[in-house]
Amino acid sequence: MESNDNQKTSGLTGQKLVIVESPTKARTISRFLGNDFQVLASMGHVRDLPDRRISVDPEDEFKAIYQITPTAKPVVNAIKAAAKNAPEIYLATDPDREGEAIAWHLLEAAEIKKPVQRVVFHSITENAVDEAFAHPREIDMRLVNAQFARRHIDRLIGYPTSNLLRRYVQKGSSAGRVQSPALRMVVEREEEIR
């Protein structure tokens, strides 16, 4: 976990908690917000589908099994500890479906039960951060579910197809929801040129 001046006061009652993805953003945003806020970095995704298993059940409403990644355990523990004493919690992960899903996974992994607010900014400037904190919102579950769908399709289609390619075509081969259609487009274009 990246350290900054506000993190040294971790656990002080009354300090609002802000969670961003990167340590660099944490340092910059911490300067903008001041000592009333503790800004921590999640370092990106904190949970994922386990390796070596599909971990998504299409027969049970696509229920997925997520686990905290080994590298994220200390980060999750630090966030969990900071959240206990924070009067307010703001999730300021990136403004896209991945960031929205990271925010949701942070709540689940750190077992945060108190209300949280989602703040979104598209640039790391004092004005943009102030504007975001003036207009907090809830986590957008439509974006979270869009990321889940993308991740689940990767696992349900790309994972077994890649295994077959490696077994029967060439070691190191892979397939996926983006690269397979892109490869088809390249092949079709090559055929047109010929």
Model-derived segments and spans:
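Intrinsically disordered, low-complexity regulatory segments
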Residues: M1-R151, P160, P181
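C-terminal helical "lid" subdomain and adjoining coupling/linker elements of P-loop NTPases
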Residues: L164, Y168-A175, V186-R194
